[in-house]
């Protein structure tokens, strides 16, 4: 069989409400409207007898030890759940920043599961594929089929595809990796404690851009304030986005440090991205669309 290829797009939390910390397992209960960008890593699978991984690309350096990479972890979980699973050599081209709040590693892991499922004739809703996604990480299940939807619980409750309008946007990462743990520590919730705040209204399917903005603008990312104490440069990135013509909303994604802004149109997004690259040449800046 020839080489199999798929994209692993950036996952953007348009909203991220932390509802509390669950008494049973200590995980943070969340509610998030997730969309995916058209900027992505690329993953290839060359069928073969051995499970291997090679990483290249501009952000390959910070991706961590190969053996601990989520691509291999996901593949091993699936192999443990499916007798005789056909394997092969993965080639990952990293374009997305690491530890950036956009689910790069989780999206890579989900991409690995998609390729292995294709190679082995498994549906993405096959119990072994779902189990492998959940075992690999909380954000992996929502990345299996990267289209806008709600996620709840600790990430394991995935809603139906919403078919939202594609939104012109700019992603900005100020070049500072931010681990999730210190951000949740700064949030400071004790086990069993709930966080006050309005829940997101029901998000309907097939909303146009104005309707999507009407839903997400009153919402929030509850990790933004604690992340600003961990990496204050996030605030600078948000301010720079908000200062651009045509910016309709700017917010942090995940636990940071990537921030995003929704713009009035693609031209405004591209102009803003160019201006930010000029102002901050060391930052990762990408005009994109979210859907």
UniProtKB/Swiss-Prot annotation:
One of its GO terms (biological process) is terpenoid biosynthetic process. Keywords: ATP-binding, Isoprene biosynthesis, Kinase, Nucleotide-binding, Transferase. Its EC number is 2.7.1.148. It catalyses: 4-CDP-2-C-methyl-D-erythritol + ATP = 4-CDP-2-C-methyl-D-erythritol 2-phosphate + ADP + H(+). GO terms for molecular function: 4-(cytidine 5'-diphospho)-2-C-methyl-D-erythritol kinase activity; ATP binding. ATP binds at residues 97-107. It is an enzyme of class 2 (transferase). InterPro entries: GHMP_kinase_C_dom, GHMP_kinase_C_sf, GHMP_kinase_N_dom, IspE, Ribosomal_Su5_D2-typ_SF, Ribsml_uS5_D2-typ_fold_subgr. NCBIfam families: PRK14608.1. HAMAP family: IspE (MF_00061). Belongs to the GHMP kinase family. IspE subfamily. Catalyzes the phosphorylation of the position 2 hydroxy group of 4-diphosphocytidyl-2C-methyl-D-erythritol. This is 4-diphosphocytidyl-2-C-methyl-D-erythritol kinase. It comes from Methylorubrum extorquens (strain CM4 / NCIMB 13688) (Methylobacterium extorquens). The lineage of its organism: Bacteria, Pseudomonadati, Pseudomonadota, Alphaproteobacteria, Hyphomicrobiales. The gene is ispE.
């Amino acid at each position: 069989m020839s080489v199999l290829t798929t994209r692993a797009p950036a996952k953007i939390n348009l909203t991220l409400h932390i509802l509390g910390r669950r008494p049973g397992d200590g995980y943070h209960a969340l509610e998030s409207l997730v969309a995916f960008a058209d900027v992505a890593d690329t993953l290839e699978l060359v069928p073969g007898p051995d499970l291997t991984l090679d990483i290249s690309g501009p952000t390959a350096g910070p991706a961590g030890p190969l053996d601990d990479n989520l691509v291999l972890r996901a593949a091993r979980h699936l192999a443990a759940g499916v007798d005789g699973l056909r394997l092969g050599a993965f080639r990952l081209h990293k374009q997305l920043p690491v530890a950036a709040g956009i689910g790069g590693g989780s999206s890579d892991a989900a991409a690995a599961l998609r390729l292995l499922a294709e190679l082995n004739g498994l549906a993405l809703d096959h119990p072994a594929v779902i189990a492998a996604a959940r075992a690999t990480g909380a954000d992996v299940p929502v990345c299996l089929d990267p289209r806008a939807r709600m996620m709840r619980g600790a990430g394991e409750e995935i809603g139906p595809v919403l078919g939202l309008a594609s939104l012109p946007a700019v992603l900005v990462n100020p070049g500072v990796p931010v681990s999730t743990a210190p951000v949740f520590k700064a949030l400071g919730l004790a086990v069993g404690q709930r966080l006050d705040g309005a829940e997101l209204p029901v998000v309907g399917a097939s909303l146009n851009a104005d309707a999507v903005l009407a839903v997400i603008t009153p919402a929030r990312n509850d990790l933004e304030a604690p992340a600003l104490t961990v990496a204050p440069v996030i605030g600078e990135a948000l301010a720079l986005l908000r200062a651009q013509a045509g910016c309709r909303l700017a917010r942090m994604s995940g636990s940071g440090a990537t921030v995003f802004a929704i713009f009035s149109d693609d031209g405004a997004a591209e102009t803003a991205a160019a201006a930010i690259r000029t102002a901050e040449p060391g930052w990762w800046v990408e005009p994109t669309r979210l859907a």
